[in-house]
């Protein structure tokens, strides 16, 4: 967050209040300097000195464009200054008839008004009517919501725009994913295109060779370095550049980053069945009754029948029918009722106090199975693990 005067000059509220504060402080310090010290309250010197420090701090924060990060701190600091200036005003007016003291009292009154305005602004919510009215005059258009320098925000936006799928702190290729709500990642705004899905599930991600199921391949051993995320077939690239071993930007994914939102099934994406995301050996989408899958042993495209059942959510499976190989080791009780997102075929609905079987409880979304056999994912903050 670089220091720039343009950050300060583009905010009329910052210019007006800081300029007003400096003028009021000059009036106060001039009156204090011209008054007779035997009749001047000595503690007021500390109040005047403290006030100029607060004004300079606010100026620096505006110039660095990180005023929002210290709003609550400023409320406390300015509140102390407000006590100092009001107390000095009382002592200077009623305990002395000196012209210098009265001049200093006038400056302290102006500083008290300024401090009160700062307390109301910095202590108010950004969406409050007063704050929105003040921020509407900002030349930046968004008030102080955009923190940091322009290049910093530009890079952050580019990183978020390159997020292909899924959730949480994963690094795929050279795009860094910031932690955020998985439900937001699954919304229509951030849905990946078919091209990004093809690149994400192809044999290579970033600069490192991958299997079709996401496991990293060692170019020397031609074997996965870690357990396969799902599916039974691996596709090893034939042309691998060994210089990639020394590249720090090799993409990777770990099991903690998989929350079930990675499950997609597309006839254009090899190995993209539910088996590639949830570790389902049969490579099937658990939300519709179809025996075909994109993550089969051949790694070929999904059958055309799968596309006809994409939005079916109410198919129920028994243990013998699913063939998922998932062991549900825990039981959880639903704290609230939850209606599945119709845009996400992997979610399941449940009602309050319903008992669910769950597994893979590390992320925000857990694999779950209802009592009727329906399998999918559920939000972890809607359920509570039971002692078994």
Swiss-Prot record:
Residues 272-282, 291-301 have a biased composition (Gly residues). Residues 327-388 form the SH3 domain. Induction: Repressed by caspofungin. GO terms for biological process: cell morphogenesis; cell-substrate adhesion; cellular response to neutral pH; cellular response to oxidative stress; filamentous growth; filamentous growth of a population of unicellular organisms; filamentous growth of a population of unicellular organisms in response to biotic stimulus; filamentous growth of a population of unicellular organisms in response to neutral pH. It comes from the Eukaryota. GO terms for cellular component: cortical actin cytoskeleton; plasma membrane; site of polarized growth. Gene3D superfamilies: SH3 Domains. Residues 250-266, 310-319 have a biased composition (Polar residues). Residues 34-42, 87-101 are extracellular. The chain crosses the membrane at residues 13-33, 43-63, 66-86, 102-122. PROSITE patterns: SH3 (PS50002). It is a multi-pass membrane protein. InterPro entries: SH3-like_dom_sf, SH3_domain, Sho1_SH3. It is found in: Cell membrane. Forms homooligomers. Belongs to the SHO1 family. This is High osmolarity signaling protein SHO1. It comes from Candida albicans (strain SC5314 / ATCC MYA-2876). The lineage of its organism: Eukaryota, Fungi, Dikarya, Ascomycota, Saccharomycotina. The gene is SHO1.
């Amino acid at each position: 967050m670089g220091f720039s005067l343009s950050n300060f000059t583009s905010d009329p509220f910052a210019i007006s209040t800081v300029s007003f504060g400096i003028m009021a402080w000059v009036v106060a310090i001039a009156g204090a300097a011209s008054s007779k010290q035997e009749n001047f309250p000595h503690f007021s010197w500390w109040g005047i000195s403290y006030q100029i420090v607060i004004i300079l701090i606010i100026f620096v924060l505006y110039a660095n464009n990180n005023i929002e990060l210290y709003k609550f701190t400023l409320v406390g600091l300015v509140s102390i200054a407000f006590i100092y200036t009001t107390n000095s005003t009382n002592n200077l007016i009623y305990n002395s008839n000196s012209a210098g003291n009265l001049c200093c009292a006038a400056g302290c009154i102006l500083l008290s008004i300024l401090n009160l305005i700062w307390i109301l602004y910095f202590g108010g919510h950004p969406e409050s009517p007063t704050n929105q009215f003040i921020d509407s005059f900002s030349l930046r258009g968004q008030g102080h919501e955009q923190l940091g320098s322009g290049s910093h925000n530009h890079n952050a936006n580019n990183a978020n725009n390159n997020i292909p799928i899924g959730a949480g702190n994963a690094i795929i290729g050279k795009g860094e994913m910031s932690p955020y709500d998985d439900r937001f990642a699954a919304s229509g705004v951030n849905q990946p295109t078919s091209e990004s899905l093809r690149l994400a599930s192809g044999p290579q991600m970033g600069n490192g060779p991958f299997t079709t199921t996401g496991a990293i391949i060692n170019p020397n051993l031609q074997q996965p370095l870690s357990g396969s995320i799902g599916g039974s077939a691996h596709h090893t690239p034939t042309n691998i550049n060994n210089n990639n071993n020394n590249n720090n930007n090799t993409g990777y994914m770990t099991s903690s980053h998989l929350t079930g939102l990675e499950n997609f099934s597309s006839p254009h994406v090899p190995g993209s069945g539910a088996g590639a995301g949830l570790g389902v050996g049969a490579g099937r989408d658990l939300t519709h009754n179809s025996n075909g899958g994109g993550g089969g042993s051949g790694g070929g495209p999904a059958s055309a029948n799968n596309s006809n059942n994409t939005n079916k959510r109410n198919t129920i499976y028994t243990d013998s029918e699913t063939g998922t190989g998932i062991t549900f080791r825990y039981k959880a009780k639903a704290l609230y009722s939850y209606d599945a997102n119709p845009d996400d075929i992997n979610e399941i609905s449940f009602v309050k106090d319903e008992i669910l079987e769950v597994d893979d409880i590390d992320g925000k979304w857990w694999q779950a199975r209802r009592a009727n056999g329906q399998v999918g994912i559920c939000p972890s903050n809607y359920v509570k693990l039971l002692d078994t």
